[in-house]
């Protein structure tokens, strides 16, 4: 593939921007993965890797996870803050604290811990805190405890502090502080406290409700003052060491981030005036990733990079400290999405394709109903040289005629054959109009979009949107989706992707199309009998954890892929995926009981013994098989 062709494909799918140097198109037109862009020779052809794994028994759909990307993301964020601190002359430290709610899988937590980079962990529930405490011995860093807390949660955090860990209990509700002080006294431990301030500043987009004055968590200004006085009265004011705020997840606009940090810096200054020695400034989450590759303020993009993000935070805090003669605090960010999103690709196979095929139309019978004659006359006029009717007018006329035919069919005025003829002719007319449209003509764009959606191939993909990409369904989040091969060809076709659940919501509605978003996906020409595998990229944050069991489709298989500079690749199975039996047990349906009931029914039939045994074996094999479709 020429460099010009490769460049065109990169632009079509915006790989150069959302891929962030981890994903590219190689000379074969295949997706290649470079888990560590600092070691460019260490890369793998993803299409070849998947096919090799399939030959060894790998089932699809499957998650292909690249732990080296996790580690590179962690290094990159740490490096950005190091550069920002050096540029400003900032004296405080920086810690990235990973909120495990983003992806609690062991492979993710341990890959980050073993990176050799400074790393803290954040918990938002008792279960998460137990996981964090169990891994804390490997980090010897910071633990931040957020979320609603009961007595057991608080005791666990204080036990961690008693064991020598640096555990910050962030007060998010005034009711928590009394329990903290009681349990700290019982355990004879000095608590290390934080306070989450509820800011007026708020981001925009799909996650804006997690920040601002109406947010679920945090203390208002009057409550912050009340907390300070409560601690002062208890002789524990020195325990309040961390200031925390959260603007929202996936902040698209750097100006919103800068505004929020400046407001929170005022809290830092005012708390020092009250005698509170705040040592850590936790700016929470918000560091976004560019799912679209548009470098914009849209909900699924960001208009900044790591360096600009780090600079805005360090300079805002540093300026506030310099203005008021205060020490530079340790800066903490809870950057889970930015660390994990890129490292996982869901790969699946297309199990069926429904294409709109075009045939040379034939004239209707002379005595055909008027609506059929009108449709045919429009078709003939489209092919007359010098016609002055617009493309839009042709399209509208044909749509009206087809609408009349559909209504007439319902009342018995048209036969099934006549309806089929009309629909096929209409498709041919749409195809003819589509060929004459100019994408550079702004007036044509609405018609192009309408026809692309109408004429797109329907691809039925072996996956559950609700299990593997729940945010695409729940909040209409966009994820990069494209074939793993065939990217050396011009994307002349369009497609929409449908999952295998029995739900009309199981469809992807938005796709990357150059610098914009479309309702259909660009596709290179392909063999409908042997369609390419598809990759769903950047699904490493939240998707595995939020996935649900709609239609009892379970977790997919997952493998960890390690790529080395000499070209060698190591693949480890990290999750075998759920069986049908696993999913049935989730809903209190015991597989053994079901098998017994089925056996009893089979025995009551008049089938011969051999056939009874065959059916029993098939039923039992299905119970312990994959929940997704499998090849024979």
From Swiss-Prot:
This is Biosynthetic arginine decarboxylase. HAMAP family: SpeA (MF_01417). It is an enzyme of class 4 (lyase). The gene is speA. Its EC number is 4.1.1.19. The keyword Ion transport does not apply. Belongs to the Orn/Lys/Arg decarboxylase class-II family. SpeA subfamily. NCBIfam families: PRK05354.1, speA. It catalyses: L-arginine + H(+) = agmatine + CO2. The keyword Metal-binding applies. Pfam families: Arg_decarb_HB, Arg_decarbox_C, Orn_Arg_deC_N. Substrate binds at residues 281-291. Keywords: Decarboxylase, Lyase, Magnesium, Metal-binding, Polyamine biosynthesis, Putrescine biosynthesis, Pyridoxal phosphate, Spermidine biosynthesis. SUPFAM superfamilies: Alanine racemase C-terminal domain-like (SSF50621), PLP-binding barrel (SSF51419). One of its GO terms (molecular function) is arginine decarboxylase activity. Its cofactor is Mg(2+); pyridoxal 5'-phosphate. The modification N6-(pyridoxal phosphate)lysine is found at residue 101. Pathway: Amine and polyamine biosynthesis; agmatine biosynthesis; agmatine from L-arginine: step 1/1. It comes from Salmonella paratyphi B (strain ATCC BAA-1250 / SPB7). GO terms for biological process: arginine catabolic process; putrescine biosynthetic process from arginine; spermidine biosynthetic process. Catalyzes the biosynthesis of agmatine from arginine.
């Amino acid at each position: 593939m020429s460099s010009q062709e490769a460049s065109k494909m990169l632009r079509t799918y915006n790989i150069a921007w959302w891929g962030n140097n981890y994903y590219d198109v190689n000379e074969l037109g295949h997706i290649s993965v470079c888990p560590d862009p600092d070691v460019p020779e260490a890369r793998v052809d993803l299409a070849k890797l998947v096919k090799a794994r399939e030959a060894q028994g790998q089932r699809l759909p499957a998650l292909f996870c690249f732990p080296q990307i996790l580690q590179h993301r962690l290094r990159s964020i740490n490096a950005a803050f190091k550069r920002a601190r050096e540029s400003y002359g900032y004296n405080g430290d920086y810690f990235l604290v990973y909120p495990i709610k983003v992806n609690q899988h062991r492979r993710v937590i341990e890959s980050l811990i073993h990176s050799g980079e400074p790393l803290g962990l954040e918990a938002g529930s008792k279960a998460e805190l137990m996981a964090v405490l169990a891994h804390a011995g490997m980090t010897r860093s910071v633990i931040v405890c957020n979320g609603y807390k009961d007595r057991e949660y608080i005791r666990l955090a204080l036990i961690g502090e008693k064991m020598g860990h640096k555990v910050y209990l962030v007060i998010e509700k005034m009711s928590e502080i009394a329990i903290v002080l009681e349990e700290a006294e019982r355990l004879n431990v000095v608590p290390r406290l934080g306070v989450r301030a509820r800011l007026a500043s708020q981001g925009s987009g799909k996650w804006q409700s997690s920040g601002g004055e109406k947010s679920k968590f945090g203390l208002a200004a009057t409550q912050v003052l009340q907390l300070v006085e409560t601690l002062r009265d208890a002789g524990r004011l020195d325990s309040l060491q961390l200031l925390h705020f959260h603007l929202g997840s996936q902040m698209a606009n750097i100006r919103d981030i800068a505004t929020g940090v400046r407001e929170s810096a005022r809290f830092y200054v005012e708390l020092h005036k009250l005698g509170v020695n705040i040592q850590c400034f936790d700016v929470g989450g918000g560091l976004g990733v560019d799912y679209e590759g548009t470098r914009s303020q849209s909900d699924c993009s960001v208009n900044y990079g790591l360096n600009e993000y780090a600079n805005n935070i360090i300079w805002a805090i540093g300026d506030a400290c310099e203005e008021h003669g205060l020490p530079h605090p340790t800066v903490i960010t809870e950057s889970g999405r930015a660390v994990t999103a890129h490292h996982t690709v869901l790969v699946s196979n297309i199990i069926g394709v429904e294409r709109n095929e075009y045939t040379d139309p034939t004239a209707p019978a002379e005595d055909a109903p008027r609506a059929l004659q009108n449709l045919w006359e429009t078709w003939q006029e489209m092919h007359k040289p010098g016609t002055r009717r617009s493309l839009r007018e042709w399209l509208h006329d044909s749509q009206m005629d087809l609408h009349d035919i559909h209504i007439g069919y319902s009342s018995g005025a048209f036969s099934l054959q006549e309806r089929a003829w009309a629909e096929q002719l209409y498709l041919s007319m749409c195809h003819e109009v589509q060929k004459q449209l100019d994408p550079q003509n702004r007036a044509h764009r609405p018609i192009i979009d309408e026809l692309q959606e109408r004429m797109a191939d329907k691809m039925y993909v072996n996956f559950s949107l609700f299990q593997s990409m729940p945010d695409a369904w729940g909040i209409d989040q966009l994820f990069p989706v494209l074939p793993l091969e065939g990217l050396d060809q011009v994307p002349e076709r369009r497609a929409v992707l449908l999952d295998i659940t029995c739900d009309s919501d199981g469809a992807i509605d938005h796709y990357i199309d150059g610098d914009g978003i479309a309702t259909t996906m660009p596709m290179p020409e392909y063999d409908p009998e042997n369609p390419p595998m598809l990759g769903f990229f950047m699904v490493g944050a939240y998707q595995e954890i939020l996935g649900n069991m709609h239609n009892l489709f379970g977790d997919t298989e997952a493998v960890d892929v390690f790529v080395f500079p000499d070209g060698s690749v190591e693949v480890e199975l990290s999750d075998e995926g759920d069986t049908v039996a696993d999913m049935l047990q989730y809903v209190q349906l015991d597989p053994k009981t079901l098998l017994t009931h089925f056996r009893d029914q089979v025995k009551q039939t008049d089938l011969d013994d051999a056939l009874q045994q065959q059916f029993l074996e098939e039923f039992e094999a299905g119970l312990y098989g994959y929940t997704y479709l499998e090849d024979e």
